[in-house]
Amino acid sequence: MNIFKTGPRFIRGYIETMRFTALKKQFRKLREAGDIEGEKELIRFGQKRWVENITPILGLTYEVHGEENVPAPEDGPFMLYSNHQSFADICATLWLMKDHGMMGYVSKEEWRKYPILADVVEYSRSIYLIRNNPKEAVKALGEAKKMLDMGFNLCIFPEGTRSQCHEMGEFKAGAFKFAEKAKVPILPVTIDGTYHFFEEKGTWNPAHIKITAHPLVHIETMDKHEQKEAQAAIEETIRSAL
């Protein structure tokens, strides 16, 4: 179901998203020049402007804890792992990141169907993941590693789908392969309250969202046994702040 309905808020939200994709000429110029740092900063600028403008349109407010745990750009790339309650989780993660750096996403394949969303995926250095397709999963792992090796951050929602409520589902074991393959640290993040925005009642509603950034987990320094233990610990850490 499309959460955006006809009316002023839909139009304003669409315009704000178009403002991000309108930067495509600048993105292409930076890519052609091989200016990775410039591209990362342009993504951050576009995402910050989008989330700061879209937030009042959607009626969202935020309460952020642990912001000091978000790595600075000079600390290198990382992956953000978060629970997934709602469509609005994108807003929550971008709000957390807006003063710290850009964020790409492991996105569902269905977004390709919508030109404006496909442009957002393309120009935010996000990647697609086709669920329940092992061959495509291997391809996505390679693409994610490439992005992270270049210095772009990535976010993944390890539950694989929205819980649409306060409760958190089980994490997919394969989700941790992204950070393990790229040898980057994980920032565990808990998001709570986004399901009030739409999923709870099936209509657009104001929502107060609590965002908790937990200490960074350096799985890139761990052996296989330690990484497996860390996976369970990360999942429990995220669940503990709900």
Language-model features: locations:
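Membrane-anchoring hydrophobic helices of lipid-metabolizing enzymes
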Residues: M1-F78
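Non-catalytic C-terminal accessory region of glycerolipid acyltransferases
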Residues: I3-F4, V138-L242
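Short histidine/acidic/glycine/proline-rich micro-motifs that form metal-
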Residues: I36-E37, W111, R162-S163
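Short, basic/glycine-rich phosphate-binding loops at helix/coil junctions
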Residues: R49-W50, D119-S124, K210-T212
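Hydrophobic alpha-helical segments typical of transmembrane helices
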Residues: W50, D89-A92, I116, G174, ...
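Catalytic core of membrane glycerolipid acyltransferases/transacylases, capturing the structured
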Residues: I57, A72-N133
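Generic preference for hydrophobic
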Residues: V64, L80, Y105-V106, I211-A213
